[in-house]
């Protein structure tokens, strides 16, 4: 069984990740291992040495200073410590050839870590419908259409799924040096990026998997499992 490292952010007096991520890794045959966000340097490297894959979870906004921009008035709370830990963990995973799955913020962080940049606020950038369609602070499960590039990993993960859930006000503007956009919403927002051993999705498969097991495909890809996932994924 493969171990999957998940960076655990500070939450009050604890370090934690939402349980949905843990449950999805378990359902895909993996063993979730939490990596405290306070890990740095040699300790972080040692921790990544002991996992077989990396999961970058959703969360707050990435600090725009990471991609050379000033914060917009709509910026949510940032966590520089988490940004640093996850970027370094991602780069270590790249060096070791580990599979990496980024979800929402995690996909955005992958882009930033490889020289990309983000749309800081979709409505302010002219994606007016996204205020309602792409973000719902009540977590009521808003959905929108998504279309993947034929022959890509995103297409295989999305097979049979024409819609995904949505909870974000930021998105990838430029994917950086390694990642290629492979899925988009109807209004052109990047919904998936990928490269060898890398997959980033803008939606939240971990919250949808409890209702529709097809959303576990991204996690089966991460763990190398074969249940419901083509070998070529």
Question: What is each model feature region?
Answer:
Residues 1-103, 112-119, 123-143, 147-155, ...:
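N-terminal beta1-alpha1 cap of cysteine-dependent amidohydrolase-like domains
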Residues 106:
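NAD(P)H cofactor-binding loop motif with strongest signal on the N-terminal glycine-rich segment
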Residues 157-159:
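Alpha/beta hydrolase fold serine-hydrolase catalytic domain that processes acyl esters and thioesters
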Residues 164-170, 193:
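Short catalytic/ligand-gating loop segments at beta-alpha or beta-beta junctions
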Residues 178, 195-198:
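Beta-strand-turn-beta hairpins that frame and shape the catalytic cleft
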Residues 189-195:
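Short, surface-exposed beta-strand/loop micro-motifs that present aromatic residues
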């Amino acid at each position: 069984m493969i171990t999957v490292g998940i960076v655990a952010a500070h939450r009050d007096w604890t370090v934690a990740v939402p349980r949905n991520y843990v449950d999805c890794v378990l359902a895909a045959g993996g063993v979730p291992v939490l990596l405290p966000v306070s890990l740095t340097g040699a300790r972080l490297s040692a921790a990544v040495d002991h996992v077989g894959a990396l999961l970058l979870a959703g969360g707050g906004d990435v600090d725009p200073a990471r991609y050379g921009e000033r914060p917009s008035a709509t910026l949510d709370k940032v966590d520089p410590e988490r940004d640093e830990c996850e970027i370094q963990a991602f780069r270590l995973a790249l060096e070791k050839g580990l599979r990496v799955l980024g979800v929402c913020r995690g996909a955005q962080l992958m882009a930033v870590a490889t020289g990309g940049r983000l749309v800081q606020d979709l409505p302010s950038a002219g994606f007016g419908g996204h205020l309602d369609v792409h973000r719902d602070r009540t977590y009521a499960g808003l959905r929108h259409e998504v279309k993947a590039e034929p022959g890509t990993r995103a297409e295989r993960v999305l097979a049979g799924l024409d819609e995904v859930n949505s909870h974000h006000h930021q998105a990838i503007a430029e994917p950086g040096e390694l990642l290629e956009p492979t899925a988009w919403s109807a209004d052109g927002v990047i919904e998936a990026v990928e490269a060898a051993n890398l997959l980033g999705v803008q939606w939240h498969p971990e919250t949808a998997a409890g209702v529709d097991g097809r959303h576990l495909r991204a996690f089966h890809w991460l763990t190398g499992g074969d249940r419901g996932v083509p070998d070529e994924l």
